[in-house]
Amino acid sequence: MSTIGVVLDEDRLRSMADDLGKVPGVRAVALGGSRARGTHRPDSDIDLGLYVEADVDLTALAEAASGWTGEDVEIAGRGGWGPWVDSGAWLIVDGAPVDLILRDVTRVEDQCARAARGEFAFHSQPGHPLGFLDVAYAGEVATGVPLCDPDGILVALAQSMTPYPDALRAAFIENLWQVDFLLNAATKGAKTGDAAYVALCGTTAAMLIAHAWHVAAGQWVTNEKGLVPNVARLPIDTAGFSAAAAAVLGSIGTAPEELLASIAQLRGLPRPATPSD
């Protein structure tokens, strides 16, 4: 059965969130991802973020989800999806694709505090080629839509992250030094025709610049998917960054001279101003 275009209305989502909120250890539930931000496609999954204590009752969670699907559901244990995406389940509910994504509420609070201090890091995580951005947890609560939040945890955290923290904005802009460092390394690979290495360095450099453009606009990033093209949709002048990045990354070349030319184009990609500019 096709799930393209199948959606669940707000009443259904809130009913599901209430079911989840009754499970011991679940503190809050929110609609997340592209549907919370209003940037979804017709075939986008429905992401439900569950903010849980470490001792959440996974068996009870599975039973609640089984009540919607009519079949057995397995909830991955902590770390089952990797150290940062953590755990959850993929479901089909009333014909719609639903992702249950568990977030340890203590870790989320910690990352909100780090974001406020201007600290961030990328971590190795399956499915995240750039790495999982730890303060994406803060971005999720800032952009999510609370569906069940009896203690006001999500509302309080979102307020603490709104507007975008100045310290975090400055940290991402200052991190642009890595772009030239990466491209200098790519130059060495280009001389030997190592297209894969050049492409990896170039893509990483473009994504770091794209992150900086988003923070310059005060916009949270929670996933590197769509990161580069979405710069063109920011409410600030980004000087054609997205189109320029797509052009060079789409034809980076294979011969040394082609790779070196692509690196030169990557160096010239528009960047947001740094404090020293």
Where are these regions (language model features)?
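Helical scaffold of the NTase/Pol beta-like nucleotidyltransferase catalytic core
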Residues: M1-L31
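Short N-terminal helix-initiation segments at or just after the protein's N-terminus
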Residues: A30-S44, T143-G152
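Short low-complexity stretches enriched in small and charged residues
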Residues: M1-D11, D47-A60, M161-A167
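Conserved NTP/Mg2+-binding pocket subregion across the NTase superfamily
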Residues: S2-G5, T69-A190
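Catalytic metal-binding acidic patch
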Residues: G33-W68, S87-R103
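Hydrophobic, Leu/Ile/Phe/Ala-enriched alpha-helical segments that form helix-helix packing faces
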Residues: L20, A65-V73, P270
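Conserved nucleotidyltransferase catalytic core and NTase-mimicking acidic/glycine-rich helix/loop elements
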Residues: P146-D277
